[in-house]
UniProtKB/Swiss-Prot annotation:
One Gene Ontology cellular component: cytosol
Family that this chain belongs to: Belongs to the UPF0246 family.
Name by which UniProt lists this protein: UPF0246 protein MGAS2096_Spy1821
An example Gene Ontology biological process: response to hydroperoxide
InterPro entries: YaaA (IPR005583)
Organism field: Streptococcus pyogenes serotype M12 (strain MGAS2096)
Lineage: Bacteria, Bacillati, Bacillota, Bacilli, Lactobacillales
Superkingdom, taxonomy of origin: Bacteria
């Protein structure tokens, strides 16, 4: 069985379905540290204006006082990649695939199933904060490595900020898809192409119930197709031809 890892997103939209917010134990220390920060501290930590930091401070205070609601993560996050993932009108098989084989890597919650209930928050591995004297990456590394050991065959749709959260020896069987546009024999890639393609790729995997590495090579989605000559055992390259 394939396991997919996807990142979080800054952009969020509130779904209709909500739950009580239950925070995993490792996240408690992060919440305590974030809730204790002033608006000025948060502005520096996030590298945002104080006006925007006030909104984030209120979110942390609400979580600390157990006033926050929680929402299925894959529905709450609404960044470009998420908007290209099929999230509505799923078949029973697609719903099972999304909730059992797709995991979200979070600097606040750890690695969680795609449908895990989470609260509105802003947090990533670039957030300037120490937890128990450690960087966020060092703090989470044991949990992340344990997940990797339990799920050796991972399809990583993660961005570069996660490269050194996992130890290298945990990623020996990982495959990272790469998405490129071809025009007049030249190949290019950028974040917009990649984010849209990640969502379309995951949707194609769900719809085709891909369970083996070889099945990924036959996928065709949003104009992309597998390119064997540019691919390696650990990097599958998908090309889309532009007019």
């Amino acid at each position: 069985m394939l396991t997919f890892l996807i990142p979080t997103a800054k952009e969020m939209v509130i779904p209709k379905e909500s739950y009580p917010h239950l925070l995993p134990q490792p996240s408690q220390a992060i919440l305590k540290a974030m809730a204790a920060m002033t608006t000025e501290d948060l502005a520096k930590s996030y590298r945002i204006k104080e006006e925007a930091a006030k909104k984030e401070q209120q979110r942390w205070q609400d979580m600390a006082s157990q006033q926050s609601l929680a929402y299925p993560a894959y529905q709450l996050f609404n960044g470009l990649m998420y908007r290209h993932i099929k999230r509505d009108k799923l078949t029973t098989q697609e719903q099972a695939y999304l909730t059992q084989q797709v995991y979200i890597t979070s600097s606040f919650y750890g690695i969680i199933p795609a449908n895990h209930p989470i609260a509105e928050h802003r947090h990533d591995f670039h957030t300037r904060i120490k937890i128990e004297g450690q960087s966020l990456k060092s703090y989470w590394r044991p949990c992340y490595n344990q997940f990797a050991k339990e799920h050796p065959q991972v399809i990583s749709l993660l961005s570069s900020e996660f490269d050194d959260v996992f130890s290298k020896d945990c990623k020996q069987l990982w495959i990272s898809p790469k998405f490129m546009a071809e025009k007049e024999g030249r190949f290019k890639t950028h974040s917009t192409i990649s984010k849209k393609a990640r969502g379309a790729f995951l949707t194609a995997c769900m719809e085709n119930n891909c369970q083996t590495v070889d099945s990924l090579k036959s996928l065709v989605f949003a104009g992309f197709y597998y390119h064997p000559d540019l691919s390696t055992d650990h990097e599958f390259v998908y090309i889309k031809k532009e007019a």
